Amino acid sequence: MLATTPIDSIPDEFHRLMNGRLFNLLSWDQLTEFWAKINRDAGWYLYAVGEELPLVAAESGQVEKFIVEMDMLLRRDHDESYCGIVYADNLDNPSLIKIYDPNNLGSSCGSSKNPPLPGWIMSRVAPTGLQQKHALPASRKRWWQNLFNQD
């Protein structure tokens, strides 16, 4: 008799990447070098977890603006001598980047039984919804909603 797996239990490509092996960008210098390697034209979906799923990949100008604004937010709100809250599946040619919100870290390394979800995800694979346990703070919601409306 063959064992079968219910179709609902087979992870999609996005969840496979989300739950796969990730590498941490420990220093601010590493993060700066990493941002420079990101191909802005690679078809990135920009997703604020808890907000609406992006239906199309962002344009290169939107990706550039996201990276610049995200870098400023992280450096301002994560007032530490190290970064340590950005993870990627590949540090030279990533398909998925998890960015943890400095104001909702919990245990982002996954050592707790209920690690928090990242605040933002950059993915070259269309994301599927992730359920936040808590509502997105109003300040983060405003930041996200205004990100591309300031042009």
Language-model segments: which ranges?
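N-terminal "first-domain core" detector
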Residues: M1-E51
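Non-membrane alpha-helical secondary structure
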Residues: L2, P6, F23, L55-Q62, ...
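Generic detector of well-ordered alpha-helical segments enriched in charged/polar residues
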Residues: P11, H15, T32, V63-D71, ...
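Polybasic, proline/glycine-rich intrinsically disordered low-complexity segments
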Residues: L22-L26, Q30-L31, I38, P94-D151
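Short linear motifs in intrinsically disordered
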Residues: E33-K37, M72-H78, A88
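Short, surface-exposed beta-edge/turn micro-motifs
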Residues: D41-W44, E80-G84
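Compact, well-ordered interaction domains used in eukaryotic information-processing assemblies
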Residues: V49-Y82
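Canonical SH2 domain fold
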Residues: I67, L74, Y82-D89, P94-P102
